[in-house]
Structures are given as structure tokens and as C-alpha cells.
């Protein structure tokens, strides 16, 4: 975070070293980047799970629409095929829902909780900035009296200004030290915090796709006809389509 330089009552004496400023900028910059990455990851994970659910729900709807097709009443082979498809789609949807629930619980919610910490952290940085501005203002006040002729009234005001400065300086130094100590610790903790979540994400995906392999393997065995390759089915479709195009009701004028 880059604070606004003091324009009114700016002290001549540098109250924060360039090294400290650079260290603070570096550590806070890393946390700002982490905050943005956490928000983006949470948003992308939510979009991904929503898309997964929409996909499986659409697949179930398609199979139900096919079951209501009049062909199922006229052709038992077609009914058997569509029934097998409907069963597979419902199984897929059930496993998909389990996967999404697991990801919501072990990935998205932890991301949300982690992200909820950043507003407090940003507020602590703002309090540090305010303390720095107060420190600079009072330091400039002390310097003003130090430059004046040392008369009785001036010395009294100088003493008072120094008394006002001391607790403000100590407050800033305490806030600054706390942030410089804790910001790196917070940043480094991200690995330990997120590792269980990402392990859970991988497990959920592995379980889901293992089940999908079984489901669609079973479906393939039920639907496969010996000697019917994809090329054979494509030729059959083209033949049927040519027959339909030959009908007078669809023939070109």
C-alpha cells in the first residue's frame, strides 16, 4: 500500500527508513496479490461447480425427454436403449452432486473463510497509515519549535510537543512492528491452509471420474451391437438420411 506523502506539517527528519518502507510495501503487496488470487479462485471454483451441475441436470432432462418420445412406445429396442441411458444419466447426476457438495464443503467454503480475513488486515494497514500521519504531523511540530529561538514560552511548547509525540511514535512503531512480523507469517501460512483443500479437490475428482468410467463402461456394454463400428453407424445414418431426403414432402422444388 502506498500512502500519500505528507503535504502539510511534513517533518524534515525521515521518521521511517527507506528499508522499512520497502519491506512494508513488499509484504503488503504480496498479501494484496494473495487476496485477489483468493477471490478469483473462489469465483472460478463456484462457476465450475455450477457448470458441472447444469451439465448433469441437462443430461438427465435429455434422457427424460427421450423417454417421453413416441418411439419408445413403438420400438422396444429403442426403449431399452433410452432406459439404459436414463439410468446412467441419473447415476452420473447423483455422483456429480456428491462431488460438488464435497468441493463446496472442503474447497469453496475454506476459500471464503480465508478471504474474510483480508478486510481486517486491510483495516490494520489503514490504522498504521493513520498512525504514521499523526507521527509525521507531531514530529513536524516538534521540529518547528526546535528551530525557534529558545525562549521560555517556546521551550514550554517544545516540551509539550515532545510529550504529545512520544505516545504517538510508540503507537506507530508498535503497529508497524506487528504488521511487519505478522504479514509474512500470514502469507506463508497459505500453503498449510490450502493444501488439505486441494487434496480434497483432487480426491473428489478422482472418485467422480472413476465412477463415470464404470457408469459409461456399463452403458457401452448395454448399447454395443457386435459388428457395428462408428463408421458402420455413420454409413447407416447417411443411408437413412438419403431416404428421408428422397421423400416428396421434403424434395426441393
Swiss-Prot record:
Cellular compartments annotated: Cytoplasm, Cytoskeleton
Name the record gives this protein: Bridging integrator 3
InterPro entries reported in the protein's UniProt record: AH/BAR_dom_sf, BAR_dom, BIN3/RVS161-like, Bin3_BAR
Source species taxonomy: Eukaryota, Metazoa, Chordata, Craniata, Vertebrata
Signal peptide: none
Gene name of the record: Bin3
Pfam family, one: BAR
One GO process term, biological-process aspect: skeletal muscle tissue regeneration
Residues passing through the membrane, by range: none
Keyword Cytoplasm found: yes
Gene Ontology annotations for the cellular component aspect, listed alphabetically: actin cytoskeleton; cytoplasm
Coiled coil: 16-57, 120-151
PROSITE patterns: BAR (PS51021)
Function: Involved in cytokinesis and septation where it has a role in the localization of F-actin.
Domain of life (superkingdom): Eukaryota
Domain BAR, residue spans: 9-232
Keywords, comma-separated and alphabetical: Cell cycle, Cell division, Coiled coil, Cytoplasm, Cytoskeleton, Septation
Amino acid at each position: 500500500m502506498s500512502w500519500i506523502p505528507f503535504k502539510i506539517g511534513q517533518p524534515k527528519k525521515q521518521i521511517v527508513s527507506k528499508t522499512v518502507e520497502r519491506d512494508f510495501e513488499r509484504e503488503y503487496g504480496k498479501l494484496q496479490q494473495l487476496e485477489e488470487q483468493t477471490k478469483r479462485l473462489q469465483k472460478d471454483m463456484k462457476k465450475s461447480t455450477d457448470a458441472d451441475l447444469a451439465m448433469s441436470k441437462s443430461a438427465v432432462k435429455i434422457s427424460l425427454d427421450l423417454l417421453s418420445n413416441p418411439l419408445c412406445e413403438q420400438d422396444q429396442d429403442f426403449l431399452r436403449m433410452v432406459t439404459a441411458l436414463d439410468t446412467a444419466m441419473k447415476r452420473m447426476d447423483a455422483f456429480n452432486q456428491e462431488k460438488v457438495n464435497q468441493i463446496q464443503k472442503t474447497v469453496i467454503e475454506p476459500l471464503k473463510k480465508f478471504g474474510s480475513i483480508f478486510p481486517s488486515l486491510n483495516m490494520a494497514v489503514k490504522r498504521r497509515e493513520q498512525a504514521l500521519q499523526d507521527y509525521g504531523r507531531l514530529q513536524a511540530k516538534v521540529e518547528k519549535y526546535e528551530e525557534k529561538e529558545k525562549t521560555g514560552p517556546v521551550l514550554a511548547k517544545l516540551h509539550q510537543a515532545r510529550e504529545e509525540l512520544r505516545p504517538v511514535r510508540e503507537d506507530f512503531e508498535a503497529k508497524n512492528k506487528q504488521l511487519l512480523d505478522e504479514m509474512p507469517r500470514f502469507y506463508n501460512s497459505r500453503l498449510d491452509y490450502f493444501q488439505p483443500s486441494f487434496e480434497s479437490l483432487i480426491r473428489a475428482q478422482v472418485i467422480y471420474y472413476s465412477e463415470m468410467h464404470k457408469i459409461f463402461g456399463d452403458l457401452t456394454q448395454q448399447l454395443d451391437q457386435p459388428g457395428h463400428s462408428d463408421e458402420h453407424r455413420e454409413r447407416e445414418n447417411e443411408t437413412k438420411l438419403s431416404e428421408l431426403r428422397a421423400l416428396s414432402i421434403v424434395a426441393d422444388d
